């Protein structure tokens, strides 16, 4: 990722995926992965909402209306069948207003651009944060209504009280434990290398301010091993750091579909037997 790419007329991130045969190691597909990554990143908050949002969630808020944010909202609207209102906050207000016009036309749901993070958060049933940059949007505890689902594919500033009084769900806690071990081995140690919402969560857990047993894996909710939403007033925060297996699964699906449709270019990497 290189923010200076924008000045060069390029995407901030230029992503690729290489799929290999698991038996031989031979490459089977080389994919441009910007759209692939955005789609899978957007899908994960929606999977969370399917299992964690209130059934009658009516107001959806999007903080950050870039490529990832739009992918998240597209997926969320697939599962939030009762959505009646969309609020969008973005630093680029003109772009947010144009996006809201597109949303209303495409989905038939009233969408409006709002002027602050607070306005987006207050009275919203599902809130997705997908901002970029060094400064994360600050979300105050009193802005979050009872029963809210806050999905975080990106970081947000949350108080310790917000974290301690909400149900915390993650994509894969074992992955966070592996990150923690890597951080301990880095110069400066664990605390010096923490960043983002995932680092904040790990710091709260390892400092004893949150009980690790109270952090729930989304997979356990889906499998029925742990409860997700148990009341309409329960506030839930779904934190995700992204897993490569998601790119792999979606990338292979795209590859299979491309083969069926005859899309793509065959590359001759070597002569047979050489």
Q: Language-model features: where?
A:
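NAD(P)-binding Rossmann-fold cofactor-contacting core
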Residues: 79-106
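Short acidic low-complexity segments
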Residues: 109-123, 139
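N-terminal Rossmann-fold NAD(P) dinucleotide-binding loop
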Residues: 69-70
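Adenosine-phosphate binding glycine-rich loop
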Residues: 162-273
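Short helix-loop-beta connector
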Residues: 52-59, 82-83, 145-146
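Glycine-rich Rossmann-fold phosphate-binding loop(s) that bind the pyrophosphate
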Residues: 65-66
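Rossmann-fold NAD(P) dinucleotide-binding segment
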Residues: 122-123, 134-149, 154, 160
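N-terminal ligand-binding/catalytic initiation module
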Residues: 1-38, 44-46, 56, 216, ...
């Amino acid at each position: 990722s290189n923010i200076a790419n924008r000045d060069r007329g390029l995407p901030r991130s230029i992503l690729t995926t290489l799929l290999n045969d698991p038996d031989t190691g031979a490459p089977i597909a080389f994919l441009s992965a910007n759209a692939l990554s955005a789609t899978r990143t957007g899908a994960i908050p929606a999977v969370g909402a399917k299992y964690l949002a209130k059934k009658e969630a009516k107001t959806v808020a999007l903080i950050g209306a870039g490529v990832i944010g739009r992918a998240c909202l597209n997926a969320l609207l697939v599962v939030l069948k009762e959505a009646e209102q969309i609020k969008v906050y973005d630093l680029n207000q003109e772009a947010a207003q144009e996006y809201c016009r597109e949303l209303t036309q495409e989905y038939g749901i009233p969408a409006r651009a709002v002027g602050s993070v607070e306005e987006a958060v207050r009275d919203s049933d599902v809130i997705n944060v997908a901002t970029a940059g060094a400064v994360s949007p600050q979300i105050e505890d009193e802005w979050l209504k009872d029963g809210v689902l806050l999905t975080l594919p990106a970081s947000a500033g949350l108080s310790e009280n917000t974290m301690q009084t909400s149900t915390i769900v993650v994509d894969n806690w074992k992955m966070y434990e592996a990150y923690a071990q890597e951080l301990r081995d880095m110069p400066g140690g664990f605390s010096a290398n923490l960043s983002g919402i995932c680092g904040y969560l790990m710091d709260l857990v390892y400092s004893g301010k949150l009980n690790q047993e109270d952090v729930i894996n989304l997979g356990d909710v889906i499998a029925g091993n742990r409860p997700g939403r148990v009341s309409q007033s329960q506030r839930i925060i779904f934190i995700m750091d992204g897993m490569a297996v998601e790119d792999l699964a979606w990338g292979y699906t795209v590859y299979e579909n491309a083969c069926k449709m005859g899309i793509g270019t065959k590359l001759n990497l070597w002569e047979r037997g050489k």
